[in-house]
Amino acid sequence: MLKQQSHIVAPIPDELRTRALYTVNELRERGKADKEAIDKLYSLIIDLTENGLDFFFLEPLRRLKAGNMLMSMAKMGINSMFKGSKMVIHKVLKKLDDRSLASILDFIEEIIHEPEAPAQ
């Protein structure tokens, strides 16, 4: 669905992409929204969120060579937002049923892409 719409992109480390796809496959095979699945999914979503926040909010400041004071203020604000996000994610995932788990796994699979080959 995303490829049919305009969208923004945030790079993630290869290790995180590999872990995301492995986790999606593992949890899809198990098909149960039990504590183990929720813990793995929570950890993955938190890492994806943290990478996205860094890229969309801190990377532009790094590219602008923002000073230490501005970077510290930005990090403090983003950390507060991140803590709030973690609480919400945790509350939502605690209430997951098997069908909702499958929907979240579909979404994660939809947003994870391998790097494109360089143009020649």
In which residue ranges do the predicted regions lie?
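Protein-protein interaction and targeting regions used for scaffolding, dimerization, and localization
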Residues: 1-120
